[in-house]
From Swiss-Prot:
GO terms for biological process: regulation of DNA-templated transcription. This is Probable transcriptional regulatory protein Rsph17025_0577. Disulfide bonds: none annotated. Belongs to the TACO1 family.
Amino acid sequence: MAGHSKWANIQHRKGKQDKLRSKMFSKLAKEITVAAKMGDPDPDKNPRLRLAVKAAKAVSMPKDVIERAIKKSQGGDAEDYSEIRYEGYGPNGIAIIVETMTDNVNRTASNVRSYFTKFGGNLGTTGSVSFMFDRVGEITYKPAAGDADTVMMAAIEAGADDVESDEDGHWIYCGDTSLNEVSEALEKVLGESEEAKLVWKPQNRTNVDLETAQKLMKLIDALEEDDDVQTVTANFDIPEDVAARLDA
């Protein structure tokens, strides 16, 4: 399987997540509300809600905002959201998966299509690119959790399938249906993880040049800034020297 994306680390260091923090809060709150509405409002009894709350805490979402999102799910006025996945190709044939949560499917489909068209890509049909990705659980630990061997042994014992470690941390991968089980087993050995979530993991990544990277970032930024879009995943990586020139 393809290694953890260096681009994701570079993106994080450049502060892109801070720029999108307010958007991120609203997207996470929506996921919490939907998860609580679909299951039990108690995170201990609702695996999806537990993961959503964990993701919110990972970006320091205030406790009262989390509780308000859960409470909203129990009200009669809670919106009905549809979860729709869009797939397509960005510049240079880079495969992109866009996960959305929307109360207006027509609006979202039109917006997503327009972003792909505007920034040199084209929207495909469901299944047109997802075969190039694996749906897996991803559990993230900071470097302080231990050295690579320690984390690898803990992951194997917990039932994980793969581990990737570098100076930025550890990424542990498992089957999509065993994420909660593996995450809980790891917590007993390594402590609480930084993040645990379901992801689309590219089977291979393509390194891109500066021009392609610039086009891709414009497309991904447009998608991520849309209130209906929850996640954007693509099978490319930006080498560090290209990333440095992106911000120059």
